[in-house]
């Protein structure tokens, strides 16, 4: 009997050691897994295609990622509070069309006797995005409309407003000052990449170093406890949708400036890419858990994947399948972590 106990002890100790090793690896994989995946993907693509690591291609990847990255950062604020914003793609189109129309008409003397201010169209585009986000936030926070329903309605409404405002036609011939935000550069670095980096830095600071950021996590972690502790849950929820709308407005102007015309059909399904970047980056759809840095890495992973598949000649249809699989896998991983806890 004693021998059986002694014989069983090493096996138990081994299991304990294996559990300890798993516990050690788990947090590391959870925190840096997406970054490791991005690095591995870059290494594989650089081996398969020698043009992948060229400076021109890297700049191209970052430029293409900037729009989705900006949208995803705004989406992160919303998802951290247990919300969702399905309207960002339509807001991209609306902000682009409205701001571009002012960039064109102001320059051609649409406002008699008024000087043309290069910043005016940008301010109008930003305000348009904030207004759309604020309306969604009002519906969610003040009238308790489910976020999915409120933003789905805004998706349709904003797209309709875009078509009405533009007459269903693109708005071309933008001024050089407006196009600079999409095609210009500073010290050789494209402006969209710089804006993406600045928005990331500011958002990271807000979420990690400010009271508002702590309140966002508190509302997402436990809304009832946050309310009991004196936090204005409705104001926080309203604010995050306004932030998402503002960043969608910026993304819309960058897109219009880069393409040289504002298309009323722009931004279709952009919300899916943004949600994918957030979820792949480790932010929980249940709220309260996530980081902007993870979202940025998630956006980069999607951008690198799309670019790599393009270089390999893979059709875009397959890219959508892979992207969908990544989203499902990321959600399954998040659910499994919660089950273990």
Can you annotate each of these PLM segments?
Residues 3-72, 107-120, 185:
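Membrane-interfacial amphipathic/re-entrant helices at transmembrane-helix boundaries
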Residues 80-135:
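Membrane-embedded helix boundary and interhelical linker motif in transport proteins
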Residues 31-36, 61, 68-69, 90-94, ...:
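Hydrophobic alpha-helical transmembrane segments
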């Amino acid at each position: 009997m004693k021998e059986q106990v002694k014989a069983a002890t090493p096996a138990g100790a081994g299991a304990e050691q294996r559990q300890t090793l798993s516990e050690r690896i788990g947090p590391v994989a959870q925190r840096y897994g997406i970054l490791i995946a991005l690095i591995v993907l870059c290494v594989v693509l650089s081996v398969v295609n020698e043009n992948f690591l060229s400076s021109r291609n890297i700049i191209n990847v970052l430029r293409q990622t900037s729009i989705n990255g900006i949208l995803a950062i705004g989406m992160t604020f919303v998802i951290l509070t247990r919300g969702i914003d399905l309207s960002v793609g339509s807001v991209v189109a609306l902000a682009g069309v409205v701001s571009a129309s002012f960039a064109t008409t102001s320059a051609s003397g649409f406002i008699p006797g008024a000087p043309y201010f290069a910043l005016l169209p940008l301010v109008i585009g930003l305000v348009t995005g904030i207004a759309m986000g604020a309306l969604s936030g009002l519906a969610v926070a003040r009238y308790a409309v489910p976020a999915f329903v409120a933003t789905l309605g805004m998706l349709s409404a904003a797209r309709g407003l875009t078509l009405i405002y533009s007459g269903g036609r693109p708005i071309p011939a933008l001024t050089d000052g407006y196009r600079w935000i999409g095609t210009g550069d500073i010290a050789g670095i494209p402006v969209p990449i710089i804006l993406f980096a600045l928005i990331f830095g500011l958002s990271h600071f807000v979420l990690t170093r400010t009271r508002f950021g702590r309140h966002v996590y508190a509302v997402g972690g436990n809304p009832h406890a946050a309310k009991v502790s004196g936090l204005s849950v409705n104001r926080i929820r309203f604010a995050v949708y306004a932030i998402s709308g503002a960043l969608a407005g910026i993304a819309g102007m960058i897109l219009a400036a880069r393409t040289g015309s504002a298309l009323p059909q722009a931004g279709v399904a952009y919300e899916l890419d943004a949600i994918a970047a957030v979820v792949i980056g480790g932010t929980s759809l249940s709220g309260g858990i996530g980081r902007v840095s993870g979202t940025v890495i998630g956006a980069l992973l999607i951008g690198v994947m799309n670019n790599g598949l393009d270089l390999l000649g893979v059709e875009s249809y397959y890219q959508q399948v892979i992207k969908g699989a990544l989203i499902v896998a990321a959600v399954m991983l998040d659910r499994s972590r919660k089950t273990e806890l």
